[in-house]
């Protein structure tokens, strides 16, 4: 199934090929044809196509092989009702200023045109069979490894989302046809060691095969495969080119908002279904009284009109029969401005009070409409819901709510506008944003079925926490699947790293403590284990781009409060630094807020075997200056140390200030509960917020360094340059005023007050 989004890519049909309508970067290239090959040469790579089998390989400027040709053929095609056949011959038909066009034919006589368009660090292949119809089309090279990406699929593989976990984010051996089944979907794959990557832009059925002998991506049941991209270059160059492709193809990467990168709170984790104005207010106040620096909150459960006592503390809504007609109609988050009046007697006053405390208030929201609901008939009448083969609005079984629902047709711009009008009912109460969390829907839906709604919300400055997504980033932060104590704990860091590899670095690792502690709905666990679980989870989450809390740590004693609060305060201090790196990711595509080490050090062989369920050295860079080394995984309750790998350079322990020279492995490095699992290195420049002031922190790591800092508005910039200072007595000059800025040594760094928009030089 292939269709055009209402936004983004505009396609024209010309000589039987899809052509991009503007926007594509131009690239100078030379074409050389021999009897057997066609060679396309650019400044950065060479693409050699063998006419027999359309076998293609990528080489570097010096002739080194980057990606080998497939041993049989580069393309396979066939009618969707049949089997794939290898392309056996290809001829050069045309060379234009922007592309090279081939005529290709399979051994069964199927003909197609193949348009190859070189870009500075990318190649687009568009394959269109000559005759109308529905086809399966794949492109393939020889095998490459190691490989990374695929978002949720890299964490779960083909396993159940709440039980399975792949042993590592590395993908060799992964095969799925079609690629489906999870909510956060990307078929972008990167090979850092080779300086290579690929993606077949297709929200419908996709094929991915990554074996020792074959690297394959393709589309099922399509008229054409117009956007198979290969990328060549350094990781930074690859992700910049991938960003341009995502935005150009209509899968936008949008500017995130600052507050989401602070510490949050979720009602479902804290209270399960027992949410009322009173319980929500009380729980938030408890966190604030204990000194937790909350900045955002989600009321995602139990706020809609319901029957008396329907969702009490130990109830479950998934199989519950509604006790009133209203509850039956509104057993979902699409109640749009309709609160349970007994549970939430003054929602506007409640929201105002949270705003006065400095919190952004968000609500749970999905796109499913229940038959008999107050807005459903209007949606059916106007054709705003997804339709079945008979052309009528279709009911879908989903994970929540219990009744089957109609799903918004987000490819219909009028339906999205209608939905946005309903959203305004929440905004009128002062709600700042929403948590998108539809699940359990048929995996036959296109992967981008929710993206246009999220994009419309973001354009309207709504705060959006996303879960369902394909390829782009039309949200502020990306949450991975519910992460509870009864599940494999290695899945969390593998999931987060896979998001980052896939170009989704604004990772939110779900609620510290998950969603089961308030009710024991996942079974009981020893309290001593749960105490350790909360502390380890908090320390792990604090080093992610966003974090939140649910069930109160005070329920498990003073030590748990102290450790989790310190983790929250660490994240709060680092929020400006994390957000600045999120802005860099938005501008460059490179996953700066959470950088897997193979992307930062692609030529270091030691970084490729760290993250797996045996070694559990789950490490990543936060920007250029911080190395996260959390102790997490299935052994969280018993482990006290990890083998920590420090890449090339000088690294300082965050707590003690002890210095190490890399590359080196700190074997059995002690990481007891409460120790900050963080090293400072790289540029040694970090910006923190302390008591409402921005502080530039200069660690004596590098004598020559520079960093660009984005303030909370995402636009105001400051450059900090370290230029051979005397670390015994450094001098900071505000280059915007020419004045010296006073500073002091604090926590192993020289610290000064930073004014947003001013540039600084350290001498």
Q: Where are the model-predicted features located?
A:
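Bacterial N-terminal signal peptides that target proteins for export
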Residues: 1-11
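C-terminal motif of bacterial Sec signal peptides marking the signal peptidase cleavage site
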Residues: 21-22
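Catalytic and substrate-binding clefts that recognize carbohydrates or anionic sugar/phosphate headgroups
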Residues: 37-258, 268-271, 277-278, 284-289, ...
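Conserved, mostly hydrophobic/aromatic
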Residues: 44, 127, 287, 354, ...
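Aromatic-lined carbohydrate-binding/catalytic grooves of carbohydrate-active enzymes
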Residues: 256-444, 474
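Aromatic-lined carbohydrate-recognition surfaces of secreted/lumenal glycan-active proteins
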Residues: 267-268, 298-300, 359-372, 434-444, ...
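Substrate-binding cleft/loops of secretory-pathway carbohydrate-active enzymes
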Residues: 372-381, 442-451, 467-501, 506, ...
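Catalytic core of carbohydrate-active enzymes
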Residues: 475, 501-509, 516-737, 746-749, ...
């Amino acid at each position: 199934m292939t269709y055009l989004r209402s936004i983004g890519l505009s396609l024209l049909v010309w000589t039987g090929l899809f052509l991009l309508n503007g926007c594509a970067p131009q690239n100078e290239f030379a074409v050389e044809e021999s009897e057997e090959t066609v060679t396309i040469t650019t400044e950065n790579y060479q693409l050699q196509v063998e006419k027999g089998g359309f076998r293609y390989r990528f080489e570097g400027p010096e002739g080194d092989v980057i990606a080998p040709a497939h041993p049989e053929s580069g393309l396979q095609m066939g009618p969707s009702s049949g089997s794939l056949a290898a392309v056996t011959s290809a001829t050069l038909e045309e060379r234009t200023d922007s592309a090279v066009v081939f005529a290709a034919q399979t051994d069964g006589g199927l003909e197609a045109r193949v348009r190859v368009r070189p870009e500075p660090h990318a190649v687009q292949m568009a394959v269109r069979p000559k005759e109308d119809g529905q086809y399966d089309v794949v492109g393939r090279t020889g095998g490459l490894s190691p490989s990374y990406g695929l978002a949720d699929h890299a964490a779960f593989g083909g396993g159940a989302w709440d039980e399975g976990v792949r042993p590592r984010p590395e993908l060799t051996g992964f095969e799925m046809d079609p690629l489906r089944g999870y909510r956060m979907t990307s078929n972008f794959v990167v090979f850092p060691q080779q300086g290579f990557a690929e993606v077949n832009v297709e929200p419908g059925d996709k094929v991915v095969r990554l074996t020792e002998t074959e690297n394959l991506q393709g589309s099922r049941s399509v008229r054409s495969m117009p956007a198979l991209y290969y990328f060549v270059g350094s990781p930074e160059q690859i992700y910049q080119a991938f960003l341009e492709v995502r935005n150009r193809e209509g899968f936008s990467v949008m500017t995130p908002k600052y507050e989401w990168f602070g510490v949050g709170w979720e009602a479902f984790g804290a209270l399960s279904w027992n949410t009322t104005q009173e319980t929500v207010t009380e729980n938030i106040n408890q966190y604030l009284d204990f000194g937790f620096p909350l900045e955002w909150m989600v009321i995602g459960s139990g706020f809609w009109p319901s029957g008396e006592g329907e969702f009490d503390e130990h109830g479950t809504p998934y199989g519950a029969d509604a006790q009133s007609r209203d509850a039956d109609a509104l057993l979902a988050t699409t109640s749009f401005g309709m609160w349970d009046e007994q549970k939430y007697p003054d929602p506007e006053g409640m929201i105002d009070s949270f705003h006065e405390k400095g919190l952004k208030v968000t609500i749970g929201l999905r796109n499913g409409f229940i038959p008999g609901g107050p807005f459903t008939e209007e949606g059916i009448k106007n054709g705003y819901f997804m339709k079945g083969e008979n052309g009528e609005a279709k009911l879908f079984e989903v994970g929540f709510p219990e009744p089957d629902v109609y799903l918004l047709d987000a490819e219909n711009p009028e339906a999205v506008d209608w939905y946005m009008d309903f959203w305004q009912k929440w905004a009128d109460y002062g709600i700042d944003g929403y948590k998108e969390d539809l699940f359990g829907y048929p995996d036959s839906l296109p992967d981008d079925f929710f993206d246009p709604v999220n994009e419309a919300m973001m354009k309207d400055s709504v705060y959006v926490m996303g879960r369902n997504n394909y390829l782009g980033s039309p949200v502020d932060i990306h949450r991975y699947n519910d992460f509870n104590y009864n599940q494999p704990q290695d899945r969390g860091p593998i999931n987060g790293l896979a998001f980052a590899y896939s170009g989704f670095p604004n990772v939110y690792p779900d609620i510290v403590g998950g969603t089961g502690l308030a009710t024991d709905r996942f079974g009981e666990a020893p309290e001593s284990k749960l105490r350790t679980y909360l502390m380890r989870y908090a320390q792990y989450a604090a080093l992610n781009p966003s974090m939140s809390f649910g069930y109160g740590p005070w329920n498990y004693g003073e030590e748990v409060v102290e450790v989790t609060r310190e983790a929250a305060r660490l994240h709060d201090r680092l929020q400006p630094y994390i957000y600045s790196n999120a802005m860099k990711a938005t501008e460059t595509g490179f996953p700066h807020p959470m950088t897997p080490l193979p992307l930062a050090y692609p030529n270091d062989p030691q970084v490729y075997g760290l993250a797996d369920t045996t070694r559990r050295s789950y490490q990543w860079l936060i920007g250029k200056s911080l190395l996260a080394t959390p102790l997490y995984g299935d052994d969280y309750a018993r482990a006290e140390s990890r083998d920590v790998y420090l890449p090339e350079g000088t690294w300082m322990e965050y707590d003690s200030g002890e210095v190490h020279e890399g590359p080196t492995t700190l074997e059995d490095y002690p990481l007891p509960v409460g120790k900050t699992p963080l090293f400072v290195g790289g540029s040694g420049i970090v910006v923190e917020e302390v008591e409402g002031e921005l502080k530039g922190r200069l660690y004596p790591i590098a004598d020559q360094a520079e960093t660009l800092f984005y303030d909370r508005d995402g636009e105001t910039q400051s450059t900090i340059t370290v230029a051979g200072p005397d670390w015994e007595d450094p001098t900071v000059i505000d280059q915007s005023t020419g004045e010296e800025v006073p500073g002091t040594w604090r926590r192993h760094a020289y610290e000064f007050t930073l004014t947003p928009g001013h540039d600084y030089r350290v001498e």
